[in-house]
Structures are given as C-alpha cells and as structure tokens.
Amino acid sequence: LHLSIRRQRQMCIRDRRKGINMSKKVAVIMGSDSDFPVLVPAIKRLKGMGIETEVRVMSAHRTPAAAAAFSESARENGFGVIIAAAGKAAHLAGVLAAHTTLPVIGIPVKSSTLDGLDALLATVQMPSGIPVATVAIDGADNAAILAAQMLALSDDCLAQKLNGMKREMEEGVAKKNEALQEKVAQL
C-alpha cells in the first residue's frame, strides 16, 4: 500500500511538472473588502493545496454587470469552482450562479445585524435551477475544502492531498482521545 501511494505521489509530481492533470482555478469573490478577513482561511487552504486562486471584490448590487460578466466567462477563463462570500442581503452567490454552469459555493458572512442569519437565508434560499452550495456562516475553510473536493473529481493528485488532510485530522483526533484517556485515568 505504501509503495503504491509513493508511486502515485511521484507520478503526480511528474505530471504537474509537465502540466498534465492540473486542476482548474478557484475564484474567491467577496461582496466587500470588509469580508476579506473571513476569507483568509479559504485562500490559505486553497493555496496550501496548490490550487490556483484568484481573489476579487465584486458586488451583486453595486457592480452587477461586472459580476455577471465574470461569471459568464469563468469557465473559459479556466475556473472550475466559484466561491462567493457576502453579508446582509448576500445576493452575490446567487447572481454569480445565475450566469454560469460552474458550481458556486456561498459563504454567508456574519454582519453586525442578525449575526449572519440574514446572509445565511439569502444565500441558501435559491430558486429551482440556480443552485448555490452553502456552507456555515463564516465557513470559509469548509468552502475551500468543498471546492477542492469538486476539483478532485477529475484530479487524482488533488484527491490524494485531500485524503492526506483527512488522515491528519483522524490522527489529530486519535491523539486528543489518547490525552483525554490519560486524564480520565488519573481521576
């Protein structure tokens, strides 16, 4: 098993050097630059997995034509997934989804009013035929992981990275459980 995994990793490294089997890009779009701190974990996660990431500010209400144009040309510009974060009325993900067949992941951003519930409802309640996959309020890290999983459907190297990440999480939980059991034994 380890030999097989090692061989696959070597093949992925060679393939990436040749430009073979490269994942598509992920667009991370925010409705306002004030949303940037919420998106930092997603940007770091995507870049950490070697996924080319383009980050932009675009408003569903202030720059609707630019948002529509970006979304309409996203596929031909090499994008595979769009992540959209917005607070309050939070129509950005829906506007982007209306103009593309690419998967759109919405991140409702917590604002000072209603603790992000308004953004959650605006992002998740989409009409039939215009789906937006919605993560938790301020759930940027999960949005990045979901985007990576979508791209991994056609990228075995990325799938390996995701498997490695899940193994690391599993090992982390096992270590925490071990430490807990030691504390319980001392009671």
Predicted regions and their residues:
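Short, glycine-/small-residue-rich phosphate/pyrophosphate-handling segment
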Residues: T113-Q160
